[in-house]
Design a protein with these regions (language model features):
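Specific alpha-helical transmembrane segments that line the substrate/conduction pathway
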Residues: 34-42, 77-111, 116-120, 151, ...
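Hydrophobic alpha-helical transmembrane segments of multi-pass membrane transport proteins
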Residues: 10-18, 22, 62-83, 129, ...
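Hydrophobic/aromatic residues within transmembrane alpha-helices
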Residues: 26, 35, 79, 106-108, ...
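Glycine-/small-residue-enriched transmembrane alpha-helix faces in small-molecule transporters
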Residues: 1-34, 137-166, 187-191, 297-299
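Hydrophobic alpha-helical transmembrane segments of multi-pass integral membrane proteins
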Residues: 4, 34-47, 63, 119-122, ...
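Hydrophobic transmembrane alpha-helices of multi-pass small-molecule transport proteins
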Residues: 41, 47, 103, 112-134, ...
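Membrane-interface helix-cap regions at the ends of transmembrane helices
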Residues: 18, 22-25, 29, 42-57, ...
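Membrane-interface capping segments at transmembrane-helix boundaries
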Residues: 286-298
Length: 299
């Protein structure tokens, strides 16, 4: 991965890491499924009138939108509703990186080398350290945990659909894919919110919406979705999944740090240790081969 693309990947990590703080603020005055529906509605409109529809098979477009946009967030919100704490949920969700690597190996025949396996194993251990520390002393319902894993698997499936789309003969512009696929989850989210929250709650949240919620929606729609998924999709189309997917493991690290800075949540020593393990594993996985070549040249 080039240095420029590495910087872009880290930008996405920071944007998505801040997501959890923004979501927490946005949910103060709005039901989660409705917030998600409005998020994707802002992504799609009015941009859809100015961006051409991606020329890819409809089944791939539907698969992408239903997995990475609807299923991921529907499973995640239901998991939290069934007792999964938000903090640990953000960590367990990063299992998507490993699901993506496995699915990429089966779908595209991508091969992993020893250095990549070692780096991924180290990063996995770091995530387990973070999860163990976050779950310590908290009762987590197994259903909530399994639903969070389902959300992670949905994200991974979306990554595979993204790579298939970007490898198609009529490769679309990434922004076109992000905007048009945002149409797909809007109605499912609003219907789910209507069933779970009721029309009175939905109407009340719209009537009483404040500037904080509006700014949260703008960040989630324009920064986290259009910019974040736009860059992420470009990188997945350019590199092997094992180079890109593990970078998302840095998201909970940024999430923990931003929560400590912005929400005054303290970072424990074990969380810091887990974050260091993840960053070391990612460095080996993504830049290990380049570092090895550089050493040979210098030698």
């Amino acid at each position: 991965m080039s240095r420029k693309d590495g910087v872009l990947a880290l930008l996405v990590v920071v944007v998505w890491g801040l997501n959890f703080v923004v979501i927490k603020v946005g949910l103060h005055n709005m039901p989660p499924l409705m917030l998600a529906g409005l998020r994707f509605m802002l992504v799609a409109f009015p941009a859809i009138f100015f961006v051409a529809r991606p020329k890819v098979p409809l089944n791939l477009l539907l698969g992408y939108g239903l997995t990475i946009s609807f299923a991921q967030f529907a499973f995640l919100f239901c998991a939290i509703n069934f007792g999964m704490p938000a903090g640990p949920a953000s960590l367990v969700l990063q299992a998507q990186a490993f699901f993506t690597i496995v699915l990429g190996a089966f779908t595209f025949g991508e091969r992993l080398h020893g250095k990549q396996l070692a780096g991924i194993a180290l990063a996995i251990f770091g995530v387990l350290v973070l999860i163990e520390d976050s779950l310590n002393g908290q009762h987590v319902a197994m259903l909530g945990f399994m639903l969070t894993l389902a959300a992670a698997f949905s994200w991974a499936c979306g990554n595979i659909f993204n790579k298939k789309i970007m490898s198609h003969a009529t490769r679309p512009a990434v922004m076109s894919l992000v905007i048009w696929s945002a149409l797909i989850p809007i109605i499912p989210f609003f219907v789910a919110s209507l069933i779970l929250d009721g029309s009175a709650t939905m109407i009340h949240s719209l009537v009483t919406i404040d500037m904080t919620t509006i700014l949260s929606l703008m960040y989630l729609a324009f920064v986290a979705t259009i910019v974040g998924y736009g860059i992420w999709g470009t990188l997945l189309g350019r590199y092997e999944t094992w180079r890109v997917a593990p970078l998302s493991l840095l998201v909970p690290v940024v999430g923990l740090a931003s929560a400590a800075l912005l929400l005054d949540e303290r970072l424990t020593g074990l969380q810091f240790f887990g974050a260091v393990l993840i960053m070391t594993g990612l460095y080996i996985n993504v830049f290990g081969l380049r570092w090895r070549k550089a050493v040979k040249v210098r030698g």
